[in-house]
Amino acid sequence: MSYYAFEGLIPVVHPTAFVHPSAVLIGDVIVGAGVYIGPLASLRGDYGRLIVQAGANIQDGCIMHGYCDTDTIVGENGHIGHGAILHGCVIGRDALVGMNSVIMDGAVIGEESIVAAMSFVKAGFRGEKRQLLMGTPARAVRSVSDDELHWKRLNTKEYQDLVGRCHASLHETQPLRQMEENRPRLQGTTDVTPKR
């Protein structure tokens, strides 16, 4: 793990959280219980405070940053997809930000909302609870259905379970030179196949 103090502020990481060794946490960063921080994530608390609350996940290649005197917050059980950028915003409890989305300064994503992949949420946007947001700029297109929220929660549970799996078995190694016979497949802990 790459942890850096900045002007006397040291990242705080709950002992039950998992932070991938290639992730970088700088300065005023607070990571809660059971959080998953993926490979190559950058949480740069050298201006504003970054808070990742319990049970949330920040996936591979995500960036969190914010201006001075602001808090960038991912609420409890928040789900931040691969490559997303969060800058000076608040992601509500149990909300999902899709892959490669950008959420700008002062934006608030409501609880249990879903931001579709590749969306751009403008600075100052004020979302409501359980909205499906999409587009560039993003706008609310409808409410999140019960099935969609259930699917989101299953996916978040996969990452919460992955925390323990990583603590138990993830370690650096050398590659094999060829695939072994009867190579096993990894199994998740829930069925997250989207319904059609």
UniProtKB/Swiss-Prot annotation:
Pfam families found in the cross-reference section: Hexapep
CDD domains, per the entry: LbH_paaY_like
Region feature Disordered, mapped onto this chain: 173-196
Pathway participation: Amine and polyamine metabolism; carnitine metabolism
Domain of life: Bacteria
Keyword Protease listed: no
Biased composition range(s): Polar residues: 187-196
GO terms, biological process: carnitine metabolic process
Coiled-coil region list: none
Keywords attached to this entry: Repeat, Transferase
One Gene Ontology molecular-function label: transferase activity
Biological role stated in the UniProt entry: Overproduction of CaiE stimulates the activity of CaiB and CaiD.
Family under the similarity heading: Belongs to the transferase hexapeptide repeat family.
Annotated protein name in UniProt: Carnitine operon protein CaiE
Protein's organism: Escherichia coli O127:H6 (strain E2348/69 / EPEC)
Gene this protein is translated from: caiE
